[in-house]
């Protein structure tokens, strides 16, 4: 899958299903995940003058993104999130 423009495809890292004390959390009580791993990167955004700005993330980077960002898609039996580079808040090094 190759994203277009400044879009990034990520695989979401799921949150823990148990609390530290061992209580199992139902899906309705879980926080929406905000961490993922970059699996594909678009070519970057194009400025008004035609210059292309390359994305700051690379395939394999672990990232933190905005809570309600992106579009969920299913591809080859796996679930991914496609979001814009501006929705990425940080890269975890």
UniProtKB/Swiss-Prot annotation:
One GO CC term of this entry?
A: cytoplasm
Q: Which InterPro entries match?
A: Chaperonin_GroES, Chaperonin_GroES_sf, Chaprnonin_Cpn10_CS, GroES-like_sf
| Location within or outside the cell | Cytoplasm
The protein's job, in short, is: Together with the chaperonin GroEL, plays an essential role in assisting protein folding. The GroEL-GroES system forms a nano-cage that allows encapsulation of the non-native substrate proteins and provides a physical environment optimized to promote and accelerate protein folding. GroES binds to the apical surface of the GroEL ring, thereby capping the opening of the GroEL channel.
Q: Example GO molecular function term?
A: protein folding chaperone
* Record keywords, A-Z: Chaperone, Cytoplasm
Its family remark reads: Belongs to the GroES chaperonin family.
Q: What is this protein called?
A: Co-chaperonin GroES
Instruction: Spell out the subunit comment.
Output: Heptamer of 7 subunits arranged in a ring. Interacts with the chaperonin GroEL.
Pfam families associated with the record: Cpn10
Q: Which SMART domains match?
A: Cpn10 (SM00883)
Q: Native species of this protein?
A: Geobacillus kaustophilus (strain HTA426)
What are the top taxonomic ranks of the organism? Bacteria, Bacillati, Bacillota, Bacilli, Bacillales
Chief localization = cytoplasm
